[in-house]
Amino acid sequence: MLVIVAGLNVFPIKSAGAVPVAEAELTTDGLRHDREYMLVRPDGRHLSQREVPELALLRPDYDGVKLVVHTPLAASPLVCEAVDGPPLDVTVHRRPCQGMDQGDEAAEWFSEVLRVPCRLVRFVGTRPTALGGGTLTYADGYPVSVLSEESLDDLNRRMDARLPMARFRPNIVLRGLGPYGEDSVTRLRGDHVDIELIRPCGRCVIINTDQDTARRSPEPLRALARYRTERFGGTREIMFGRLGVPRALGALRVGGELTAS
């Protein structure tokens, strides 16, 4: 089945705002520059919108050299260049990894803006995916997340709501599968691109956070729980979308076609 790439989103800083792009390079670790940075507490634990919803208000822009972060929480943006700072031992959901510290100026800016002591680190090394034999940067368990427009449309109909796709923070938005059609897709292929979809995407309280205001409500997690709770790997999770691992690398473009199988 042919499907359309309806949207592409890169998240330079884990748990911060998205950068919608018209084209993205698919690497072994996901979309180029996705989750390349992360904010960590003094003990190395990553910051997440689960505990700090204001992360949604950070608007990063990153070209591989210079990181610029705007936010309504600060009068002036942060502007800093990527540096090979001292390595720090950090964790993503208790899984150990490393990051290069990006200096005191960045740490002070983020700590003041978020009112949480933290430091900015840039990814270094390799991390294995939870399943599927891939690698990733600071994403939770898999380097690529996928969701279809039709699945969101169905959820909005059930809720009589108009939630935007931004609530669900997918890397790749698809059009043409039908509601929850991605559930049965195991492969997305295009010109020089091949993504294996490994498992459903388990959802948490982050999707209850308005990505424009950082305000949190009970929905849509409560609505999804009524009809999208499934068992995977011995645990029950609320599933919406799919997670995958790149198998062949190339460029993805909004408006481009992929073969879903």
What are these regions (language model features)?
Residues 1-261:
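Metal-cofactor-dependent catalytic cores
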